[in-house]
């Protein structure tokens, strides 16, 4: 099985790349693709860059050049679930855009025109992620809605509006829905694994800088444990 793994920033992919064997690196359009073996599987680890546009470019290039059988999006996120702490993990039950609004044409809030309102992860990948949770010890993981937008959320007013629009949201970040939308259009199975780096509040910027390495490592360990289940 060939697995594509996408993270936005260096701390989100560093442990994965360090753990690979027989790896080779290729850079296309400023995006690095590292191909090799990880946990007994053929993988391509991609550092996409931050935001929905770069994530879309990276996902499209990954699919077109390497033809992966599945894609895992890994990295950090801001937490919205009361029972999760920094470093805990959210496994996608569905993925939505939180900054899209074409409701004037009859679409749901967050739904891009001519696209589904929610992008659903592959059931087998989610099941593998659930099995992988047990190997992480004290780290807690839940399934939940992950929402995506091109903003770092640290404003209580913005947070309140987002929760009004998406009351079941467990985490928000800046790439997953773009990756999921590309996977949807190419019919490539996907799952999103995100570890919390902050709680999407006034302290988020400080928390993010302090905890991004921890969040990136936890998410990477979860991805490796997931791959071992495939």
Swiss-Prot record:
Pathway: Amino-acid biosynthesis; L-methionine biosynthesis via salvage pathway; S-methyl-5-thio-alpha-D-ribose 1-phosphate from S-methyl-5'-thioadenosine (hydrolase route): step 1/2. SUPFAM superfamilies: Purine and uridine phosphorylases. The active site is at residues 12, 198. One of its GO terms (biological process) is L-methionine salvage from methylthioadenosine. It catalyses: S-adenosyl-L-homocysteine + H2O = S-(5-deoxy-D-ribos-5-yl)-L-homocysteine + adenine; S-methyl-5'-thioadenosine + H2O = 5-(methylsulfanyl)-D-ribose + adenine; 5'-deoxyadenosine + H2O = 5-deoxy-D-ribose + adenine. Keywords: Amino-acid biosynthesis, Hydrolase, Methionine biosynthesis. It is an enzyme of class 3 (hydrolase). GO terms for cellular component: cytosol. Catalyzes the irreversible cleavage of the glycosidic bond in both 5'-methylthioadenosine (MTA) and S-adenosylhomocysteine (SAH/AdoHcy) to adenine and the corresponding thioribose, 5'-methylthioribose and S-ribosylhomocysteine, respectively. Also cleaves 5'-deoxyadenosine, a toxic by-product of radical S-adenosylmethionine (SAM) enzymes, into 5-deoxyribose and adenine. Belongs to the PNP/UDP phosphorylase family. MtnN subfamily. This is 5'-methylthioadenosine/S-adenosylhomocysteine nucleosidase. The lineage of its organism: Bacteria, Pseudomonadati, Pseudomonadota, Gammaproteobacteria, Alteromonadales.
